[in-house]
Amino acid sequence: MIVVSNRKELDELIKQRISEQGFNCYLNDIDVSRVTDMSCLFKDSYFNGDISRWDVSNVKSMSFMFEDSMFDGDISSWNVSNVEFMRSMFRDSRFNSDISRWGTSN
């Protein structure tokens, strides 16, 4: 497991993986539990890999995270209960997966 402490480290690692393995690369071996900001992370991206096991329970902002992206993976099990900002998270993206069980009361 690769532990990242902040958004910058995560962004750099994702760019490296996509460069080496392509847009369907596996990212579930990255521990993102310390990251609090994922805004614009995959914005304008062709990424469509597996991030289903990410622990996003400490994330506060996911605004524009997948805007204009090709992502359509299964993220239904994400714990988004602490996310405060989801503005335009999936705006103009290909995302069409079921997230109806997300607890978004925050």
Where are these regions (language model features)?
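Negatively charged
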Residues: 1-106
